[in-house]
Amino acid sequence: MVEPTGIEDVQEYDENSEEYPAEYTTETPETVGETYIPTAVGPSLGTGRRKTAVARVRVVPGTGEWKINGKSLEEYFPNKVHQQLIKEPLATLGFEGAYDVFARLNGGGTSGQAGALRHGLARALAAMDPEHNRPPLKKAGFLTRDARKVERKKAGLKKARKAPQYSKR
């Protein structure tokens, strides 16, 4: 036999009514008219790594100029996919055109260097104003080091994992 729980008066609320409990809503309150203005004055440094590439990045408040090993972003990375990948941390924070980026890249190929530059840029932006910049960059995954590297070739195998054809007889 089921015993009564003592909860017999259950109220149902309309979401639009004033009586609707605020703690049940999942919407976050919007900050109306508040836009964050960066206050950084000096340069910010960040080191990024991806595969075997290393990027040393310096971010300075400016006009959106890019210098990578003495070349512009479009010269150094002609591939639009790499350019978009690199600019993602600035786009996430809404800082496109607000900072000049100077970077020294070495090691690895184009894809690894693009990933290293994005990682270094995200670290530099996070170091600039950790309170405001770090949470969105962390949530987007830009501050996480991608630890994947090429696996070494093993003796007796053709590649890292590819074995020669096996014959039973």
From Swiss-Prot:
Gene: rpsI
Chain spans, region Disordered: 1-29, 128-169
PROSITE patterns the record matches: RIBOSOMAL_S9
Segments traversing the membrane: none
Annotated Acidic residues bias: 9-21
Family that this chain belongs to: Belongs to the universal ribosomal protein uS9 family.
Entries under InterPro entries matching the protein: Ribosomal_Su5_D2-typ_SF (IPR020568), Ribosomal_uS9 (IPR000754), Ribosomal_uS9_bac/plastid (IPR023035), Ribosomal_uS9_CS (IPR020574), Ribsml_uS5_D2-typ_fold_subgr (IPR014721)
Matching Gene3D superfamilies: 3.30.230.10
Name of the molecule in the record: Small ribosomal subunit protein uS9
UniProt keywords, alphabetically: Ribonucleoprotein, Ribosomal protein
GO molecular function, one term: RNA binding
GO BP terms: translation
Record's GO cellular component terms: cytoplasm; small ribosomal subunit
Organism (species): Thermobifida fusca (strain YX)
Biased composition (Basic residues): 150-169
